[in-house]
Amino acid sequence: YGLPVTDDNRLFERLILEINQAGLSWLTILRKREHFTRAYHDFEIARVARYTARDEARLLGDAGIIRNTLKVKAAIENARRIQALQKSHGSFAAWLDAHHPLDRPAWQKLFKQTFVFTGGEIVGEFLLSTGYIPGAHAESCPTYAKVLRKRPPWSRR
């Protein structure tokens, strides 16, 4: 948590998990993570972007994941939107890097304009977990030094 993530599929995974965590405990999501990984085909953006109504129904019937219609639709739509960003910027990570650094409100506005089901808390936690904003670990935490050695985007200002 807080380490930089540069792989697009892993970034997508974090976004989907953050979206699904909304209103629930992280423990619930972590217990279902394996199911999410299988259900969303290892969060392969290209594959999820091709999901059909049949795939949506499959996901909504999968007791191993969060079966919320808005969250399932958001995962599929956001995969399609990330594909568009990959075409325009080369990768989702490159799109994030192209906008860095922004303050939290600016990131939230950008995500709201670009994606669906991305409220302020979801965006903040996504950016925190992937190393785009500081605060995942206190400086006194042993993990903080490990995070810093990986040069997360927030440390490169």
What is the predicted function of each stretch?
Residues 1-157:
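HhH-family (HhH-GPD) DNA N-glycosylase catalytic core used in base-excision repair
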